[in-house]
């Protein structure tokens, strides 16, 4: 049975933050990387998270409760949108940092990376921040359907090198690629002490052959 997402709270300042004891996994990424589309894909319906072709539209922290598991997926404002004023960019960057550092329930960061782009400076900096903060990192390459197999494999190799061996998950909101695997990884991060079933061969998917698992029916 697929979990359900329920929008439980939206805040614009940390003073509005409601204390949740349940684990929280932050969704972070550049503006227009596809966070809202990813949330809607996980939910299995359009409209739960508002999407826009204009970068930088999400200017709040949205808390989605995962039922029946009880943990939260927290959608953070996108970063790096050049058309925002410097003061506004700094305001939201500060809010994101404070949330990640000052919220004990945050147990991991899912960093969304545009599969079409080589590693970007702000993404690399966020990955380094997560390591310094001791937060597990789940890298997700979004918009993978827009890239050919060779480009997907290249992007996975680039990020594997940067992340010290961690291979990003391929994901597409359009085709559903990686949806089931992402749910599995989110649950694993929320409840790290629980035992999980592993693939029959027990081996991770090779980085240079990413299509093997992703092209199977979700």
Swiss-Prot record:
GO biological process, one term: division septum assembly
EngB-type G domain span: 21-192
Role description: Necessary for normal cell division and for the maintenance of normal septation.
Name used for this protein in its record: Probable GTP-binding protein EngB
GO molecular function, one term: metal ion binding
Family assignment from sequence similarity: Belongs to the TRAFAC class TrmE-Era-EngA-EngB-Septin-like GTPase superfamily. EngB GTPase family.
Record-linked Pfam families: MMR_HSR1
RNA-binding is among the record's keywords: no
This protein's record includes keyword Cell division: yes
The species this protein was found in: Oleidesulfovibrio alaskensis (strain ATCC BAA-1058 / DSM 17464 / G20)
UniProt xrefs under InterPro entries: G_ENGB_dom, GTP-bd, GTP-bd_ribosome_bio_YsxC, P-loop_NTPase
Superkingdom of the organism of origin: Bacteria
Residues involved in Mg(2+) binding: 36, 58
Gene name tied to this protein: engB
Coiled-coil segments: none
Record-linked SUPFAM superfamilies: P-loop containing nucleoside triphosphate hydrolases (SSF52540)
Cofactor(s) this protein cannot do without: Mg(2+)
Amino acids binding GTP: 29-36, 56-60, 75-78, 142-145, 171-173
GO CC entries: cytosol
Keywords on record: Cell cycle, Cell division, GTP-binding, Magnesium, Metal-binding, Nucleotide-binding, Septation
Region called Disordered, residue ranges: 194-218
Taxon lineage: Bacteria, Pseudomonadati, Thermodesulfobacteriota, Desulfovibrionia, Desulfovibrionales
